């Protein structure tokens, strides 16, 4: 690694300080880089972080390293109780982003006169890291959503007839969430936009409280407005590439399919999950011809993406679906019209396990 032109600093204390903060910044960048590499599989972030490390390395002159005095450094071995609270990978990443930003700021201040090239590089990297940290946070959220999606078994889709004013919608969904459903898809074709927004906000809050995914049907604007985990689209809705551009790469994108070619197209276009159905006749879409179990069997062999069988599913016909290869189901009436939505949800979940 070729060093930048440099005249040694006369003040030993400043040289030691710069050496320590170069070490701190480079080490912290490596921690973030490795998470982007192994945890997020984001090559473009890895390359950016690697470039920043190497740029700092070119400023890490021998005279700084020779000023190092580990034996007399009063900060050696010091720790903070907060370090024991980093239970998730993102906690480690966030702590190291902050560590790097602080180290770079110190370098800017103390290297401005004796090593202006280092100060300029530190400033540029610090501002770049502010933006990259947000990108990593979003990527981490997307990774978590997709992992959670893999573990989903039962998705509740709401009905347009539910009335928020009587608390039926919230009460029913909350009961199902308490029972352990993994995912809620908000669907309301009849309400005004203002009522949809109010309902979606309430449901999104409920889902966050219970650790469940919250998806909005059709309406990307509504999904973004309430910070939903994703959006579900039908065959006549926006093309996948347009939808992805609007919602970003870190939110989930689902697509309804009625036959194998649609499934293959949705998978090739980058959808995160699929709806397979309607398996049976439904009151929600009475005009839609049911596909029966044949397509369910095809889907079970055709894709590794998570997919949900949908359409007139209840406890009485669930076993036949399981035998056909369905591991996940989406239901509407079975729970929304139940006198005991919690008990029905538990019954369906137990049958899926």
Curated annotation (Swiss-Prot):
The record ties this protein, via InterPro entries, to: Aldolase_TIM (IPR013785), ThiamineP_synth_sf (IPR036206), ThiamineP_synth_TenI (IPR022998), ThiD2 (IPR041397), TMP_synthase (IPR034291), TMP_synthase_cyanobac_bac (IPR016229)
- Residues reported in the UniProt entry to bind 2-[(2R,5Z)-2-carboxy-4-methylthiazol-5(2H)-ylidene]ethyl phosphate: 282-284, 312
**Protein name according to UniProt:** Thiamine-phosphate synthase
Any one Gene Ontology molecular-function term assigned to this protein's record: magnesium ion binding
Its ancestry begins with: Bacteria, Bacillati, Cyanobacteriota, Cyanophyceae, Synechococcales
Q: Write out the GO cellular component annotations.
A: cytoplasm
* Annotated pathway: Cofactor biosynthesis; thiamine diphosphate biosynthesis; thiamine phosphate from 4-amino-2-methyl-5-diphosphomethylpyrimidine and 4-methyl-5-(2-phosphoethyl)-thiazole: step 1/1
Q: Where does 4-amino-2-methyl-5-(diphosphooxymethyl)pyrimidine bind?
A: 185-189, 217, 256, 285
Q: Which PANTHER family match?
A: THIAMINE-PHOSPHATE PYROPHOSPHORYLASE (PTHR20857), THIAMINE-PHOSPHATE SYNTHASE (PTHR20857:SF15)
Q: Which family does it belong to?
A: Belongs to the thiamine-phosphate synthase family.
Q: Which UniProt keyword terms apply here?
A: Magnesium, Metal-binding, Thiamine biosynthesis, Transferase
Known CDD domains for this protein? TMP_TenI (cd00564)
Q: Which organism does this record belong to?
A: Prochlorococcus marinus (strain MIT 9313)
Q: Give one GO biological process term.
A: thiamine biosynthetic process
Q: Which free-text remark accompanies the cofactor?
A: Binds 1 Mg(2+) ion per subunit.
Question: Which cofactors are required for activity?
Answer: Mg(2+)
